[in-house]
Amino acid sequence: MFFDFDSVEYYSLNKNKEESVVDNNKKGIKDSIFNDIFYGDYPNELNNSVFYKKINSDDFSKFELSNKDAEYLRNYIFIDKFSLKMFEANRACAPEYRDILVFKKKNKISGIAKICLGCGQFYIISSKKEIQTEDFGTQKEYKSLKKLFESYKKD
């Protein structure tokens, strides 16, 4: 298991913020913290207050995952496993992390997973030291995550 957790918060980038970031980047106007979140391997530590302030802003929608969905993530998605991922097609694009999961144990952050459903890339940081993420992210897992995320975005 990648994270020791009892609850999961899901953050979804709002479409209007995504469009404004792309437009501003084209104009040379950059929000370096937001660009780090959206495009990069950031944060590099769990207790980064700037990261949490930014994802708790109006730029993201926040959802508390149900116990059932958190259990699904624990038992089927974020686990150490052997997969045949190496035989799947690799995608070569720059990730755009629109979907972020924050894992908590007793209200303390135990991990972060940033997911790019568009190109199949991910960034994971955990309080556990020896996690193996190489086999994470099969097409089936991304399809399951997309379905899960969409179920929370519905109004």
Segment roles from a protein language model:
Residues 1-155:
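Function-determining sites in protein domains
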